[in-house]
Amino acid sequence: MNKTYKATGINLKAQAMGESDRIVTILTQEFGLIRAIAPGSRKHNSSLGGRSAMFVVNELLIAKGRSLDKITQAQTIKTYPGLAKDLGKLAASQYLAEIVLCQALSEQPQEELYELLNEHLHRLEELPKGESFGVLAYLAHAVFHLLALAGLTPQVQICCLTQRSLTPDFADPNWRVGFSIASGGIVCLEAWEGLRKEARKESKEKSLPHPVTPAYQTVVHRQEIPVISARLNSVELGMLQQLSQPEIMQINTTSDASWLSVEQILRQYAQYHLGRPIRSATLIDSYFAANHDATV
């Protein structure tokens, strides 16, 4: 086995090590997720200082080590300076990095995930300054695509109970559809209510005294009643249904509250399936709460 290898990767996480080093977690096209020491990168004027920063893309020469590999050369080929200049964009980028760190594999090529992450970071960076809720829309779009790549796409076109297509009724302001995280997507509330009524009726019948106990029992398997995690209006479902498209729909600033709802649903869904909280989401909450207060 070669003692050194080349890789192209983007830095997703960095932590201090010793007096002057960093351990950098990098998503590479060729080898997936790797952790490597950036020696001396915390020293003033270190050549690896800026190259070991978050969301920097480098061509790397890495030396194999017993427990941790070591970066010996790094040539920067792409940076995203616009992300650090906007708190909302930075929080959204860190949010995406957390999801990628959960789903990326090690010692396997991850070219599709690498390309997808870079594409969405580029889109976030290119957003015009001041479009705070545009950040939420682009974040939701990116999260949906990352979930789809991992095979965790939420079902947003058909009901998880009836398997029938659900189309939002924009003419009815009271129209609603349920979203069940455990069931994996949207739920027709009429079908859901029907199941609940059936279950209540069955429960009452079981509680009634039976004069004669039959010699046999009939076992009936009822459809499980899903827990409704959220209720969406027609605009919110319409947004959710369009997130599978390669390009995001035109952002309507009158729908800011709807983007908040869509992001919250996708966040809860991602956390459930990834099995861990997205810590950067608290920054998103703080940022958009502050922006909402400033515009009220």
Curated annotation (Swiss-Prot):
<protein>
    <recommendedName>
        <fullName>DNA repair protein RecO</fullName>
    </recommendedName>
</protein>
<comment type="function">
    <text>Involved in DNA repair and RecF pathway recombination.</text>
</comment>
<dbReference type="GO" id="GO:0006302">
    <property type="term" value="P:double-strand break repair"/>
</dbReference>
<keyword id="KW-0227">DNA damage</keyword>
<keyword id="KW-0233">DNA recombination</keyword>
<comment type="similarity">
    <text>Belongs to the RecO family.</text>
</comment>
<dbReference type="GO" id="GO:0006310">
    <property type="term" value="P:DNA recombination"/>
</dbReference>
<dbReference type="InterPro" id="IPR037278">
    <property type="entry name" value="ARFGAP/RecO"/>
</dbReference>
<dbReference type="Pfam" id="PF02565">
    <property type="entry name" value="RecO_C"/>
</dbReference>
<dbReference type="InterPro" id="IPR022572">
    <property type="entry name" value="DNA_rep/recomb_RecO_N"/>
</dbReference>
<dbReference type="Pfam" id="PF11967">
    <property type="entry name" value="RecO_N"/>
</dbReference>
<dbReference type="InterPro" id="IPR003717">
    <property type="entry name" value="RecO"/>
</dbReference>
<dbReference type="InterPro" id="IPR012340">
    <property type="entry name" value="NA-bd_OB-fold"/>
</dbReference>
<dbReference type="InterPro" id="IPR042242">
    <property type="entry name" value="RecO_C"/>
</dbReference>
<keyword id="KW-0234">DNA repair</keyword>
<dbReference type="GO" id="GO:0043590">
    <property type="term" value="C:bacterial nucleoid"/>
</dbReference>
